[in-house]
Structure formats: C-alpha cells, structure tokens
Curated annotation (Swiss-Prot):
Name this polypeptide is given: Replicase polyprotein
Region (Interaction with and inhibition of host AGO2) residue spans: 106-114
Site, as annotated: Cleavage: G166, P167, Q190, R191, Q328, A329, Q739, G740, E884, V885, D908, S909, Q1220, C1221
Pfam family name, one: RNA_helicase
GO molecular function terms noted in the UniProt entry: ATP binding; cysteine-type endopeptidase activity; endoribonuclease inhibitor activity; RNA binding; RNA helicase activity; RNA-directed RNA polymerase activity
Coiled-coil intervals: 1-29, 1385-1413
Domain of life: Viruses
Length: 1771
C-alpha cells in the first residue's frame, strides 16, 4: 500500500489539526524528509518562540472572521500534498503556506511575514510538544525503533482494516530473494551484530561491577572524587557510542564510499559518451561528403545511450513547469528564476553553445586573428565588437523578455524599478501630508486629482506580487494615510463646486390623460443621445425623478436630466411656501447648487443637472412666497410648450370642471408603435404680462421631432457657452504669457521660523524661565509682535503630524533597503567577475557565428572561403574590389593610385604593413607603433562615490534631436538703434521643415509689428559657431504699409480643420536664397498617431542658450507631457510696453508639460522619448507660465503641415513651388559625423567615405629661354601647405576657400527686382536677326547634351580630357578624364557599360530634381595649377577651382545650354561678351558700344568676386531671366511643365547652394557659385549687369533722385561684361556722380570690392577708351586693318615665353607659345614685332632653342588676322 493511500484512508480518523500535524511529522521523519517538512514547524530562534507564546493564530484561538471550515479543508490538502510529494523544497512549501494565509486570513498581524519559519499550528501546541520533538529526534536515530514506529504509525493511520485490507500480492517474489547464499550472508551479519552487542553488554556489566573508587589520602580530596566519577561516566558513554553511534557512523561511511564510487563510475561513462558525441560532431564538421551518414550514426548513438529519452523527459518536465498555474508557489519560483542574476549568464552560455554548432568548428587562433583583423578595418576592431555586442545583447534581451512572458504568463516589471517607483509614491504621500499641501485639496482640482491618484496607485502596488516582505509591509503602512487623504478629497467641495451650466428648463403643460409623462422618456433618450450617451438603458439611470415633498435628494448621483412630474401641485403660501418654487430659483442658475442628502457619505454632493423637465396641467402658478415673481418666470418661460393632440388623432371629452378638451383617441394610435409620438404637437407659449392668462401662443405648433431637435440644439448652445465662460474664468485666473521674463525681488524676514526656537532653547539651557524670556521679548514691541505670531504658528500634534513622523521613518528605511539591494548586487557582480566574462565570451562567439553564417551565405559554395588571405590558390576568394580603411599592403586589396590612410605614420608611401598597426595610449616613438612599455595612468585620489552609467530611454529620439534637428534649428535675432547705439535682441527659435520653408510662432510676427520694427530691419538666423548665416529683412514677413499685421505671399499660417488659425506660421525663404535644409516632416506625428498620445510622456525641447556672446545648444528636459484638449489664452508680456492689436490671443488644443521655460524658447520643437512611437516630433513650444513652471506647445501633425504647405504654394504658384523641395545629404556621406568647414559662413554636412586628394606638384616648368628675353613677373602658385618668406605657414586651400564664406549684403528686394527686370529685357531681346530662336527654345536630348548639337558653335560637346568629378575619379579608369564614360575617339560612346552607368546617374539626378530632392552633387575644391604674379604667390594666394561631377554637367547642359547659346549668339548687344572672338570684328563692336555715350569710360575688376556674390541675385536671375524664357516652350499649368520647372529649379539650386568636398569633409556654401559649373561665366555676367544697376539706383537716390529709374540708366550708360570684368561708357550728364570713384565707394557699402582693371588702386573718375584694359587687352585702332583691335599686354606676351608644361615634349609647347607671341605682338606695331623677332632669332642661332621657329613677315601676320586664317583665332 502506498503511503499516499494510507494518508487518504486516515483522513476521517484524525480529530484535530494538531493530531494531523503530529502524524504528518512522524510520517515525514520516517520518509527522511525532516528537512522538507519538520523545519517548517520549527521556529528559527528561541526568542521568537517566547514572543509567540502569548499569541494565537486564527487557526487556533484567534478568530479573524474567516471561513474556518474551508480553511481547515485547504490546510489538510496542503499537508497531504506536502507529505506525498517529498521532492518539494522548503521554498515551494513556504509559497503554498503563504497562499493559504493570503486567501483565508489576510488581515492577521503575522500574515505579511508568514512562511519565514513561523508556525503553521499554534505556538501553545508547539510548546506543549517541544520535549516530545526532542525525544523523537533521539529515537529516530535508532534503526530498530524507526522500523517499529514506521509500522505502528502506518497501522494507526490506516484506519479500519476491513475497509483498508492493505497491499495485495500481485506478482511472485524474484528468484534473487530466495538465494541461500544471500540468506547465509544475512545470518552471518546478524550473528556478527549479536556478538558485538553481547560484547558491549558485557563491557557495561564489567564497568558497573568494577567501579573505580578513591583510596588512601585521596579520600579527603573532593576534586579527585569528581574526576574518578567523571571517568566512570566517560566509560559509559564510550559503550553508548560503540553500541549506538558507531554502527550508524559505519553504515554512513560505507554508504558514502559506495555512492562516491558509483558517481565516479557514472562520470566515467558520461565522459565517454560525451567524448564519442564530440568526435562524431567534429567529423560531421570536417567530412562534408559523409554528413548524412554521420547524422544517422549520431542519432543511433544518442538512442543507444538513452539521450533521446532524457531530452524528451527534460522537454516534458519543462513544459509541465511552464504550464503549471494552479499553485502560486510554482509561479513565484519561476519569477525568481527569471530575475535571478545567473539567468542572463546561463542564457548567454547556452547561446554560445548554439553558436558553436552553427560555426561547425572550434575557432582557432588564426580564425580569431583574421576575425579581429577584419573588424579592425570597419573601422576598428573595438568599434565593430562594440556594435556587434550591442546588437546581440539587444536581441538576447528581447528573447529574455519573450521567455518571461511565456514562462510567467505576464509581463513583469523589474523589482528594482518597482521599488524605486514605490519610493517615489511614498514621498508624494509624505509631501501632501504637510498642512499647506493638505489645505490645497479643498481649493485646487489638480491637487485633488493627484491625491486621489495616490490612493489608487497604492491599491495597485498592494496587488503586486512582491517577494520582499519589508516592502510589502511598507506598502500596507503607507496605504492608511493615502486612504485618509483620499477620504478628504471625497469630502472636498472642489469635487463639485464652482460655476455650473445653467440647465435647459422645459415646461410642458397639457390636460390630464393626454400622455405627457409617457412622452417624457423618448425626449430624455433624444437629449441623452445628443449628449453622447448612447447606451440603451441610459435613460434609466441618467434621468432623476425629483419629488419635492421629499426633502432629500436621495439616489441622486450626478444625473444629467431631472424630471419634475406634475409639478407645482402644492399651493404656495407665505406661511407655508411651496419648496418647488424656490427650488426653481436655485436650480435654474449657474451658481453651484449644494444638494441636501440624508446619508452622511453622500454629503458634499452638487447638482450636475443640465436639463430640467417640468410637466403641469396649466401655466397659471400661484406665487406668494417669493418677493420677485419674475425670477420664476424668467427661468421657466424660455422653453414653455403646451402639449396637445393633433386634431385627427383626438376626441373631444369633458373634464370634471365641465370644460371640453381634446383627449387622445387610443383607437387612432399606430398599433406598431408602443409609444406613438406622431400624435403630439407642441405649441410654443410666450409669457405676456398684459394678457389675462399671462401666456399667449407663439407661432405655429410643431411636431415631436422638431420639438426634440429644438431642445437638443438649445442644450448644445448652452453647453458651448458655459464651456467658453469656464475657459475664460480659468484663463483670467491664471494668465499665460508669451514666454516673457519677469523681474523678481527677494524679501528676507528677520524673524524666521527658527529664530525664536533657537532663543528659547538657548534660554532653557542657560536656566532661564519662560516668563523671564517673554519679558525680554516684550521690551521691544516689534519683537513681541513677532513672538506672538510665532506662538500662533507653533504646530500642534495631530494625527497628520504623527503620520508624517512615521512616514519619514518608513521612507528612510525604504531608501536604506534600496541602497542595500544595489550594494548587494554590485558586490555579487564584483566578487564574481567571471560571470560577466563568460557572458561576454558567449556574445563574442555568437557574433563570430553570425559572421560565419553570412560569410557562408554570401560567398560561392564552389570556392572555399578563408577568413584571412593565405595565398593558397585553392582557397582564394573570387576577385572583387575591396575598399580598405587603411593600407594593408596586400596586393589584392591595395587601391590603385591612391595614398592610403594609416592609423600611425609608417613613412612608407605605399603604406605596406607586415603587421597589424596597433594604436598606442601613449607615444613610444616607434614607427611601427609597437609599445615598448605599458603606459600607466595614475589617479591621485580614489573616488568616494561610484559613478553609474545611465542608458538613453529612446536612442532614436536622442539621435533625431542631436543629429537632425540641430542642423535645421536656428536662433533668431534682430537689431535696432537705441539711444544712438545699435543693440541686438534675441527673438526666439525657428525650425526649417524642409528646403527653404521654416516654421515659427505667429506671435513673433505680431511682436515685430507691435514693436514697429522697420521693414528694412534684418532678422538674423544663427547657430553655434555660425553667426548670422541667414539674413532676412522684416519686409519678407510683413507686408509694408499695412494698417494691421498682414503676411506677405511668402508666409501663411497653419489652420485647424475648421479653418481656425494656429499660433504657427510657415515662411518660404527661397526668394532670399538661403541654403536648403533636410526634410524633417517625416519625423512629425500623423493624425493616426495622436490616438496613442494618451497619458503622460517625457521628452525634450530643442532650443538655445545664450552665455555672454556665445550661443550654444540646449536641450530642455520636459516632464509629464500630456494633451490639453481646451483653449488657452496667451497674454503678451506685461513688460513689453508696445501696442498690440489685442492684449492676448487664443490657442486651441495644445500639449502641456512641466518645465522651467524662459524667454527665447518659443518656436522650439518638442520631441517625445518613447520607443513605441515611430515618429517623435509632436509640436512647437509657444508660451510658458513662469510662476507654475508650465509650458505649452502648439500641436502639429504631418497632415496639418502639408495643408499649410499647399496653402503657401497656392498663394504664389511660381515662387512658392519650391515648398516641396528639400536637401538630402549625398548617399556616401556620414551626416551624423561632424565635418570641418573652412573659416566663414559655411554649413557642415558630414564626413565622406571618399577622401579627396590634392595635387602637390605643379606641371609648370621653366622654358629653356627662361629670363632671357624678359624678367619673369610670374611663378607657379603654391599647391600645398607652405612657409612664406615672412615665416608664416599658410594653407592656400583654406585661405582661398575663406574668401567664399565672407559676409554679404542684404539688399532691398524692390531694388533688386527693378534691376533684374531691366536685365531681363536686355538679355532676352533678339539682336541677331539671322538667328532662329526656336532652335534654342527647347531642352537637349541626352546625346546632344553630351556630344553637342553639331549645328551651333556654342553647343559643342563636353571636353572629355578633364576630371570626371566627385565619386567618379575614385573608380578604376583606363583612360584619362571622362573618356571611360564618353569615349575617346571622334564619336562619343553611349553603349558601353560605363556609358550606361553614366546615363542612369543622369536620369536619377533628374528624377530627384523633379521630386524636389537636392542630392548627390558634390563639387571638389582643388587648387588651380597656374602662374600668378610673384607678389601674390609670395603672399600665399592661390586660386581655388571647384570641379563638378560629370553627371551633373550633362544634366545641366541638357536644360540650360540652349539658353546660354542664345545669349552668346546675341553677345555684346545684350551686355554679355561671352563668346567674343577678340581677333574678329567683335572687338570693334565692343569698342563702338563703349563710345555710344561719349568718350568717358571706366573699366573695373572685382576683388573676391566669387565670395561676395549675393545669393539673393541668383534667385532673381533665374526667376526674371530664365523663367520667362522657360515659359515660351513650357506650360507650367500642366504636369510636364511643372516637372520641368522643378528639374530646372533643382539643377539651379545645385549651383547657387553647392555642396563641396575637401579631404573627407563635406559642407555647403551659403552663397557664391562653384567655378567649375557649366554656367559660371554666364551667371557672373548677369550678376555684373544687375549689380551695376543697383549701384546706379543707390547713388541716384542720394545724389540725383530724378535719375534712379532704369530708363535713365539705359539712356546714360552702356556696358559690357565678361565674368567679373566690366567696362562702362558713361554720358557727361551723370559722370560727375556716377564714375569710377563713386561706384567703388558705393560698392563698399553693399560689401563688394570694386577697383580699376589692374587692381592698382590708382583710380580716376573717367579714363578714356585707349587707357583701359578689358580681358587684359587694350582698345587700339589699327590703320592697317581699319578697325579696333585687341593687343595683349606686352609683359604678358613675353612672360608666356618663360614657361612651358611638363608633358612628353615640353619644347613643343614652347614653340607653340613663340608662334602665339608673334601673332599677338603685331598688334603693337612693326617696331615691337622686329624687337621680338631679333631676340628669338638670336636665341635660335645660339642653339638655345630646340629648333628653328617658323616666323612670318609682319604683313603676313596682319593678313592672317584679317582673314582669321590661323587656328589661334578660332574661338
């Protein structure tokens, strides 16, 4: 019979729980389970026993009101379960006991600590049986006694023998039990035991008979007697040991030896099994051809050794553990396991083992070396390892979370996090226990709501399963004061006080019996549906029937409708007034109505009724008790109706008074309707004091449906009215200012709360009495008055103060508890660092497994992949181009013709390394960077506190704020003159949403208008280390000369759905040509996301901080961001004394948050830190409440912003089409890395993967006749960082780029537009009558843009010998320049693979421009290898050239080359000299143009022309010159027309806001244009024409106002320009105020440098034509040619002979230069020709020249110039 069956049968024979426990204790001892059961009955320490001795549990004497019978039944089940399942450990059993106590006795004083070794039975019972327990422990050590008692106990517990006959012999005895040898062995052992027992018995008898006695003189020594007696006792104990303990000890030793031997044998077998499996697994990894066979063998071995069964048993056991949810003990154990610190470590180790099988081999030393080597290249091993560890850990943590969900069945919070949360909750309770805070409960609804939430949070914490008993007890302690505060909230008037909605009063009269009461409920349902209460049974509990005869409003619980059926039936009398009359006065009012309730718990109830329904039989109400009857009728007359039956549905009847009236004819009702509402009609009644009946009909009767709609509409209007009134009152009580600063003063009180306390304490210690000290205070009246106030304010001891004291102690204890837990965790980890190391190793192996997996997946199976390069042909990888981070020296991975970048400097130009370069902490001086010794870092003082790292709650939001927003956010300033001094004021913040569209609060515009800021005042956009990068005048925002704030067409406000404007304005700055920005619109939330924005969130405010004159970024942390669905009124700053249109404005629906915002934060973007939200940006900060530290944000969604962009585009479809454009960084740019920029106004974009190199050696060489004909005046410019003669070290590239970032002027838009319109008329006029204009009004094909049209000299093919530009020059090439993509022969290549790739790049660029995406065009900044004047070279001045990529060149030519060709075919007459052949009659035409208005001319040159270009001009050039041309063959109202316009705008933007690269830095220019674009000279000419007209207008305004029109300019000035060179012919009428000197001075005012053509600085007002130079040529009339010719300066002619270039044959270039020199010198006359000829012939005769030059006669050269016969004349 099993022991479980014995227990089941013994259940009915046990009389008490104590007996059951005793029997169970015996059974547990017999089964050897004392550790599992007996210890649960035994008290941990004797002091606990004494404390519990006087107590009783509910199971014995103490009665707590629980179900005793059910409790005892559960306890029996519990004990049976424990005795049967001996595998339960103490913790599991304790959990069961805990669940029992929680279910049946949760209020017991020891309930919270039950299970920690306390008793399950009463302490009194345990004390009574303590001796028995001790004896039992001695008895149980004897085997015979144990066997005897086992049988006896089983018989006692078995009950009736007949009902339980015992076990049945169901099978025979095994043969081994009948072995005679076993019987003999057993008898021998028995005889041995008997012999030992007999010997011990005899020994005892001998000791007893022959006791040792003292003799002789020892008899008198008591000490000796004691020692002898002790010796006798020791002999007795030795016998006891031999008889009792020694056999047991011997048996235990034998058992231990046998067990150890068995375990050793089992271990050997297990090791052998594992070794066999490992060998098979290794073979499986090596022998790929025999994998199938090996798998079969492995499966057979596993089955042979029984591994398959063990695995299945483990899985089933795990499944049972997971699915076991019937007992709390199992759940709590799993929870503890999941949160055990070893869980993560074990999981990572398992993960590592799985990775081992995935790798299919044990990583060796070479594998790890190669693995680390590869990680080192991308970019370094440490960075790569960190990223992989982060990724693997993240996925592992996600897996752990899923395991927790599956195993535990719920999402569990971290215990540590929950403890911190409880700590904060307790502190909040302690905060509101203070008297000042507690008083706010009755005054502040927000405080009341917070206190109410504290109690609810406490209830939630009490339901949590918290293993720590101290924390659970702490929660229980804190719940009582939280409940007391909650009860105070319930009794607070703030829950119902304040203004209420004036109820809609409906007064229905009619004869009795027509069904007024029956009709009331359908009316209630219709009203409730209008209120939004649509539940079918809502009318039952939302309509309250009021009986006035009952004094109390019992049963009222905030119902919205109150019905007074048969009202005013009681007569009103002065002595006994009708309470209904006065209740009408109180109820129908906005003043709060405090209801009279009978129950105490219902006190403090206020009326919330919104509709009052009165039914009466007549309108005449007798009013005697009130002094002003009109007060009654004013409340009742608004909706007074007489209910009557329609004629066709009525029948005439007579009432008791003999009057006839229409009653309802029930026979005419609709049988299908339970209540037929169609029979009623409602006659509106109007109160008329002059009428006899006081009431007259008002209009025609209406049906029920119309009546119900009228009442619902009236309710809705009154509801909205009340809502607005309450909003106004709230706003009036707490005015929110538009984030203005305020001045505060600090006051100090001499007698603070500690002053008298300190004096009294000191006095008592000195022996003074209270009377004596009070007399001293009374000597001064002011001091005595303060003392009286101090006595009044002495806090009295209350229950709140007691709770405050207790809570302070509890909170302190909890803080200590949390610190101890942290210290224990830290200590555990620090003492066991190998756990962390094992976890890290697991992650590393996992990372290596992932790497191996992808390597196997992505490589060809037919070729064995190697981790590192071994040089073996069989294992060599497929040849492919490898990109290195640094040079490795490997032939296979070395980049062609590129200097690699090393971690350290090796001095090797090829950067070939034999070993991996190591990065040192300190410098060792070794070129190989090998460390000679470890560098030690000393710490002077040990840190006293431990620094803890804190992770970011939302890395995506953090990256968004730091990387994206910071490049789109600007701080705004403006300047104005104050008392003769220009002062700078901070306005606030603006954010660019995309491209040129920025967003800012609308009240900025109002502020500028109210402060009367002049339209010409500039608004400066600044960022840290980039001041005033964008400058925009106020006139761009506010229309000038407007009587109120009126936005320009470049601005629009964002609206709500109902067209209500928000405090947010969008501004398009494309007309001001500021640089474009990235598109961040996708980061704003959508409308669909707003449903998830419930509750409270955390976030940040991206703003700026001004420290002295330095601007830095600031990120304001926002607490408790929550939606606020109500209007707020925002007031302008009180300190701002300017005149606003109104003192405040309203913002509907906003986000509210707790943050100490300040002036200047307005306009900052609010971002959420929430991983569950894909999009993070929710709004823009607009106002703040400084006193309450609250801020508010205007909500923004993608839909709302897109609606605003569409509105903006419709305002000006041409100029605002750019609102859809945006900038995106190039594809190979790391925009998250901060790149460097040259000094000046540039915008950093990031770092490039491609590092651009620079030429370091010039190709210019001194010719063989250098300095022999003339003294050299030029030399090659510097191409590298150079030390100048004055000792200064100069980087010529940085010095040249600095000129492009200078500050530029902001000009009046009207002036710029006037100049642009005049230039448009000039350049678009067709002067060449032989020209077919339709030939140019088109776009080119791809082929035409590449190879040219073939029919126009100004639309030739692209020069293919020049650089292909960014990204292309890094590609392997066989031919120089662009020839790999465009071909090298006469025909251009369009079919090769490279040609097709280029075509795809061009098409992709065009598609991006069509979508408004500015992307993937980078100009490379390089130094120009040329000769410059010696003084400029010595000053370190080298010109910078910016080369464009070839795909952009093709695309730009496709859309703009025809327009450029048209301008060049109409050259000179359109003021543009581009395309001029200086040897032809073109020079004569230029001369005639410069003599049109007389002989006074000027020739000028701009200093730093490219750097001073104003971006504002570029927009006008494109808009006023190219756009009209574009419209002649494109309809912008069609889709194709809009697409083409967007393409042209995109390509133009790539020029005027070009992206540049030097080194690996990528940045954007804010103005100017790159010199390497196809339109450079044309753009400069247009700019030149515009700037001279602007100077004319500015000078005329000051000196000749009547001459400032463009008509006067054309009448008095004619000009010609080529790039930045120009010449002007000026009439005598204006030359005194418009000349070389005045123009130069005016140019300085608009930040341009304009000097004479030679840049000498010696300027005259108006030189003659023969004195000036244009394009380094003069204007000379040739009598031989009879026209004006262009002789080149003589020093330039002779200088070209001093130099040649480093080509295959430099002398060939010299001979070409000699030929060109003779053709140029002839224009200077025959004498100069003879001088040069004699010098050249002399050098030839001396053999200095490499060959004899071919020299023509003077007349022959003139003839060639006349006929343009030589190729030198062919332009």
């Amino acid at each position: 019979m099993s022991f479980q069956q014995t227990n089941n049968n013994a259940t009915n024979n046990i009389n008490s729980l104590e007996e059951l426990a005793a029997q169970e204790l015996i059974a547990a001892q017999f089964e050897g389970n004392l550790d599992g059961f007996f210890c649960t009955f035994y008290v941990q320490s004797k002091p606990q026993l004494l404390d519990l001795e006087s107590e009783c549990y509910c199971m014995d004497d103490f009665d707590c009101g629980c179900d005793r019978i059910k409790r005892e039944e559960e306890l029996r089940k519990l004990i049976f379960l424990t005795s049967d399942v001996y595998g339960y450990n103490f913790e599991e059993w304790k959990g069961l006991v805990w669940k029992f106590v929680q279910n049946y006795c949760p209020e017991h004083r020891y309930g919270s600590t039950f299970g920690n070794g306390l008793l399950i039975v009463s302490p009194r019972f345990f004390m009574d049986h303590l001796d028995w327990f001790q004896q039992w422990k001695l008895v149980s050590s004897n085997d015979e006694c144990r066997a005897f008692l086992r049988k006896r106990t089983q018989l006692l517990m078995s009950g009736d023998v007949e009902s339980n006959p015992g076990p049945v012999q169901s099978r025979p005895v095994y043969a081994c039990d009948n072995d005679p040898r076993a019987i003999r062995l057993e008898k021998a052992l028995q005889r041995r035991d008997e012999k030992i027992s007999t010997l011990i018995k005899k020994l005892r008898q001998e000791i007893k008979n022959n006791r040792i006695y003292t003799q002789g003189f020892f008899d008198d020594l008591k000490g000796a007697k004691g020692e002898v007696g002790q010796l006798n006792g020791n002999l007795t104990r030795i016998c006891d040991f031999l008889e009792n303990s020694l056999p047991t000890l011997t048996a235990q030793i034998q058992t231990t030896v046998l067990t150890t031997t068995d375990k050793y044998v089992n271990l050997k077998e297990d090791l052998l099994k594992v070794a066999i499996l490992l060998v098979l697994v290794r073979l499986l990894m090596v022998w790929k051809k025999y994998r199938a066979a090996l798998i079969v063998i492995i499966l057979f071995v596993m089955h042979f050794y029984g591994f398959d069964k063990q695995i299945l048993d483990i899985v089933l056991d795990l499944k049972d553990k997971i699915l076991q949810t019937t007992t709390q003990a199992g759940t709590e154990t799993l929870e503890e396991v999941v949160y055990h610190p070893w869980f993560d470590t074990c999981g990572k180790l398992i993960f590592a083992v799985l990775a081992f099988f995935a790798i299919k081999k044990i990583p060796g030393k070479q594998d790890w070396d190669n693995y680390i080597s590869r990680l080192d290249r991308i970019p370094k091993a440490i960075e790569g390892s960190k990223k992989i560890v982060d990724y693997c850990s993240e996925y592992f943590n996600l897996s752990v979370d899923e395991v927790k969900k599956v195993v535990l069945g719920k999402e569990l919070k971290g215990t540590q996090g929950l403890y911190d949360e409880i700590h904060v909750w307790a502190k909040e309770i302690r905060h509101y226990l203070d008297l000042d805070e507690r008083n706010k409960i009755t005054l502040d609804t927000e405080t009341a709501a917070k206190v109410e939430d504290l109690y609810k949070r406490g209830l939630k914490y009490s339901e949590e399963k918290i293993p720590d008993r101290d924390i659970a007890r702490f929660i229980t302690t804190m719940l009582f004061p939280a409940k007391s505060l909650y009860e105070q909230v319930l009794l607070s008037p703030v829950k119902g006080g304040g203004p209420k909605m004036r109820p809609i009063t409906v007064w229905l009269t009619g004869e009795s019996g027509i069904g007024k009461t029956q009709m009331i409920y359908p009316l209630c349902i219709d009203i409730l549906r209008e209120m939004g209460i649509v539940k079918p049974d809502a009318y039952k509990h939302q309509a309250y029937a009021r009986q006035v005869e009952t004094e109390y409003w019992d049963g009222y619980n905030g119902q919205k409708i109150v019905i007074y059926d048969d009202a005013f039936q009681l007569k009103d009398d002065k002595t006994k007034p009708n309470p209904e009359i006065f209740e009408v006065i109180r109820t129908c009012n906005t003043f709060p109505q405090h209801l009279h309730m009978a129950a105490l718990q219902d006190k403090n109830m206020y009326s919330q009724a919104e509709v009052l329904l009165y039914t009466t039989n007549q309108f005449q109400v007798q009013l005697e008790s009130i002094t002003f009857p009109d007060a009654f009728y004013n409340r009742m007359k608004t909706h007074a109706y007489r209910v009557q039956i329609k004629q066709e549905k009525s029948i005439w009847v007579r009432n008791a008074r003999g009057e006839e009236y229409n009653a309802l004819d029930v026979t005419k009702l609709n049988k299908d309707e339970a209540i037929d509402l169609s029979v009623y009609e409602f006659q509106k009644m109007r109160f008329d004091d002059e009428s006899a009946t006081k009431w007259i009909d008002d209009g025609e009767p209406i049906s029920y449906d119309e009546f119900a709609r009228t009442i619902c509409k009236a309710w809705k209007e009154e509801k909205e009215k009340t809502f607005h009134q309450l909003q106004w009152l709230e706003a009036y009580a707490s005015r929110t200012v538009a984030q203005g600063g305020s001045e505060t003063s600090e006051y100090y009180d001499v007698w603070d709360e500690t002053y008298f306390s300190n004096l009294l304490s000191q006095g008592f210690m000195a022996g003074k009495s209270l009377i004596e000290m009070e007399a001293e205070f009374a000597s001064d009246a002011e001091t005595f008055n303060a003392y009286i106030e101090y006595k009044k304010n002495i806090p009295k001891e209350t229950k709140w103060s007691k709770w405050m004291t207790i809570l302070d102690e509890q909170i302190s204890a909890l803080s200590t508890k949390i610190r101890e837990l942290k210290n224990k965790a830290y200590k555990f980890i620090s003492e066991h660092p190998y756990l962390t190391a094992l976890g890290f190793i697991g992650v590393m192996i996992s990372a290596f497994a992932m790497y191996s997996f992808f390597e196997r997946t992505l490589t060809d199976d037919t070729i064995t992949s190697e981790v590192g390069s071994s040089g073996d042909n069989k294992t060599q990888k497929i040849s492919k181009r490898v990109v290195e981070v640094g040079g490795s020296g490997d032939v296979k991975t070395t980049k062609p013709a590129k200097t690699a970048v090393e971690v350290g400097s090796s001095g090797d130009s090829k950067t070939m390394k034999n070993k991996i370069t190591k990065v040192e902490v300190g410098s060792s001086g070794d070129s190989k960077t090998q460390k000679q010794r470890n560098t030690k870092v000393e710490v002077g003082k040990e840190l006293e506190k431990e620094a803890e790292t804190q992770g970011c709650s939302d890395p995506a939001a953090h990256a968004l704020v730091l990387d994206v927003l910071q490049k789109n956010t600007y701080c705004l300033y403006y300047e104005r003159m104050v008392k003769g001094e220009m002062k700078r004021y901070r306005l606030a913040t603006a954010t660019f949403l995309r491209g040129w569209v920025c967003m800012m609060p609308y009240h900025f515009i109002e502020t500028l208008y109210a402060r009367k800021v002049a339209p010409s005042t500039n608004i400066y956009f600044s960022q840290p280390n980039c001041d005033d990068v964008i400058v925009v005048p106020v006139s761009h925002f506010i229309a000038p000369n407007a009587e109120r704030v009126e936005l320009t067409t470049a601005c629009t406000r964002i609206h709500y759905k109902d067209e209500t404007p928000r405090d947010c304005v969008l501004v398009n700055l494309h007309r001001r040509m500021c640089h474009p920005h990235r598109d961040i619109l996708k980061h704003f939330v959508k409308k669909s996301d707003q449903g998830n924005l419930r509750g409270v969130f955390q976030g940040t405010l991206a703003t700026f901080h001004q420290s002295a004159n330095e601007l830095c970024r600031a990120y304001q942390w926002l607490q408790a961001i929550r939606p606020l669905d109500q209007e707020i009124t925002i007031y302008h700053e009180d300190t701002d004394m300017f005149d606003y249109e109104s003192e405040s404005y309203t913002q509907r629906d906003c986000y509210e948050y707790n943050a100490p915002t300040q002036t200047g934060n307005c306009g900052s973007i609010v971002g959420l830190y929430n991983k569950r939200m894909e999009r993070k940006l929710i709004g823009m900060h607009i106002p703040g409440n400084v006193s309450e530290c609250h801020g508010y944000a205007c909500p923004l969604t993608q839909e709302a912003i897109m609606d605003g962009l569409n509105r903006l585009e419709k305002l000006d479809p041409v100029n605002n089409i750019t609102v859809q454009c945006c900038f995106e960084p190039p594809s190979d740019i790391k925009d998250t890395m901060s790149g460097e920029t040259p000094e000046g106004k540039f915008c950093a974009i990031g770092k490039s993967n491609i590092k651009v190199g620079q030429a370091v050696k010039t190709t210019l060489l001194k010719s063989c006749i250098y300095g022999m004909l003339s003294k050299p005046i030029t030399k090659p410019a510097h191409l590298t960082r150079t030390r100048l003669p004055n000792g200064e070290i100069v980087d010529p590239l940085m010095k040249g780029l600095k000129k492009c970032g200078v500050d530029t002027a902001v000009l009046d838009a009207e002036i710029v537009e006037s100049a642009a319109l005049d230039v448009k008329q000039v350049v678009l006029t067709q002067y060449n009558s032989m020209l077919d204009v339709n030939k140019y009004r088109r776009f080119l094909t791809y082929e035409e843009a590449t190879q040219g049209t073939g029919d126009d000299d100004f639309m030739k093919g692209i020069a293919r010998q020049t650089s292909p530009g960014y990204r292309y020059f890094q590609m392997p090439r066989k031919l120089p320049g662009k020839q790999d993509w465009m071909g090298s022969g006469e025909q251009y290549d369009f079919t090769s693979q490279r040609a097709q790739e280029l075509r795809r790049d061009v098409e992709e660029l065009i598609d991006n421009c069509a979508k408004g995406i500015i992307k993937d065009v980078v100009f490379v900044d390089t130094l120009k290898d040329e000769r410059r004047p010696i003084e400029k070279v010595d000053a370190g001045k080298t010109r910078v050239f910016s080369a464009g990529p070839q795909h952009f060149v093709v695309a730009f030519r496709k859309y703009f080359l025809p327009f450029a060709a048209y301008l060049m075919n109409n050259r000179i007459d359109n003021e543009i000299a581009v395309g001029t052949n200086v040897y032809s009659t073109d020079w004569e035409r230029i001369a005639k143009r410069l003599k049109k208005h007389g002989n006074k001319v000027i020739a000028g040159d701009f200093g730093n022309f490219d750097g001073s270009l104003v971006a504002q001009f570029f927009g006008q050039s494109c808009g006023k010159s190219f756009y009209p041309w574009f419209k002649t063959f494109n309809d912008v109202n069609t889709e194709d027309g809009k697409r083409n316009l967007m393409i042209c705008i995109g390509l133009w933007t790539h020029i005027v806001h070009s992206v540049h690269s030097y080194g690996d830095n990528v940045y954007m220019w804010t103005h100017s244009q790159p010199s390497g674009n196809p339109f450079t000279v044309i753009i400069n000419c247009l700019y030149n024409s515009m700037i001279m007209r602007i100077v004319w207008i500015l000078l005329a305004r000051k000196l000749a106002p009547e001459m400032q029109s463009m008509k006067k300019f054309r009448e008095n000035v004619s000009m010609i320009s080529y790039g930045d060179d120009n010449c002007l012919n000026i009439s005598d009428r204006v030359v005194e105020w418009f000349n070389q000197i005045t123009i130069s001075e005016q140019m300085k005012e608009i930040k341009h440098e304009y000097t004479d053509e030679g840049k000498t600085g010696d300027m005259v007002k108006f030189p003659s034509l023969s004195e000036i130079h244009f394009l380094k040529k003069r204007f000379v009339f040739s009598h031989q040619l009879q026209r004006t010719v262009a002789p080149l300066q003589k020093d330039v002619i002779y200088e070209m002979l001093n130099w040649t270039r480093n080509t295959i044959d430099p002398n060939e270039i010299l001979m070409m230069n000699i030929n060109t020199a003779f053709r140029e010198i002839v224009y200077h006359g025959k004498s100069e020709y003879q001088k040069l000829r004699s010098g050249i012939e002399d050098l030839a005769m001396k053999g200095i020249l490499p060959q004899q030059p071919q020299i023509l006669t003077f007349k022959a050269y003139l003839w060639d110039a006349t006929m343009l016969a030589d190729e030198v004349y062919d332009f």
